[in-house]
Amino acid sequence: MKMRIAALAIGALFAVLTGATAWAADKDAAPPPVSTDPQTTSASYGDWILNCVRSQDGSSRVCEIVQTFQIQGQQGPFARLAIGHVGAKDPLRATFDVAPNISFPSTVKLALDDKDTQPVELTWKKCVPGAGCFADAELKEDVLKRWKAQTGNGRITMKDSTGHDVAVPFSFRGLPQALDGLAKS
């Protein structure tokens, strides 16, 4: 019994000393300098927000335009539609992420309205606990041209976990200006 208590005491002392050494090393390390350029920026264009984030070393920026969706009476968004480039030379992609309440196999459709015969189909890529389920697709130039000409609401459709179709309206208001801002970023 005494050996067990001694072993526990030695283990506790080791943990304290190890933690103190790590804390001292962290305390002595200088934080990186702060850039004169902002690390993150955002600009609103109607119902769309252009978000840009600078890399840690300041050598590049990643930007996307976003529209979030919130259920009345609930805190925080339940879904998000984002448009951006994965890499600087890559084509524009639309990404939809939503809380995990979906059916497989299924797709997400982005349409001008309920009569649109050429909706953009986004393929589910992954579901991440605590983050949501993600679907995406490349946006072709003809689709962007049609979307820029719209003034009302589009329609996002998907299947929920019970297999029922769910429709969520999204806004085209400010999309042309947001896409122009994205192109300049």
Language-model regions, residue ranges each:
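Bacterial N-terminal signal peptides that target proteins for export
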Residues: M1-I10
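A generic "folded-domain core" signal
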Residues: W23-S185
